[in-house]
Amino acid sequence: SSSLGVTSFGIRVFSTSSVSHVAIYLGENNVAEATGAGVQIVSLKKAMKHSDKLFVLRVPDLTPQQATEITAFANKIKDSGYNYRGIVEFIPFMVTRQMCSLNPFSEDFRQQCVSGLAKAQLSSVGEGDKKSWFCSEFVTDAFAKAGHPLTLAQSGWISPADLMHMRIGDVSAFKPETQLQYVGHLKPGIYIKAGRFVGLTQ
């Protein structure tokens, strides 16, 4: 998802992406997410209210038990802090990693290039030592904790755009362990493309 706020706009510009936020739908109209207020569980209505566009990707082979474990993880770390340090480190990384996306390079080389830059530029925190998360880090950790990792890359390396590109038929900067399935848009929103605003319905 994304919003029309300055923070969302900045993330989209630095990541050259149309999205700036990711969350997990837990069922029963509840959404788990990490925002500036920390890790929280909010209603779907509230999540939609602070998004100018919102679309849904599904993990096709997620089991009911894994879904339960994701919910348990979200409840366990609810009210934890937001990983501001990780976001500050992420800004220059989002800029320098663009060199790995040049057309002459193969997909494997691009993934190795981005991983190498991440190791050099981003901090590494042990899973048991974490006290805070940013949105895509939280989503990545939640699926990993449930035994259904989206990628084997460190969660602190993953941006909302990286998760979006793990959908079927797309190419992600990090090798996906699971290809996500596009379900549909809940809010079409406004997309930034070629220096202008355009509306999309799909």
Give the ranges of each region predicted by the language model:
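Cysteine-nucleophile amide-bond enzymes
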Residues: S1-Q202
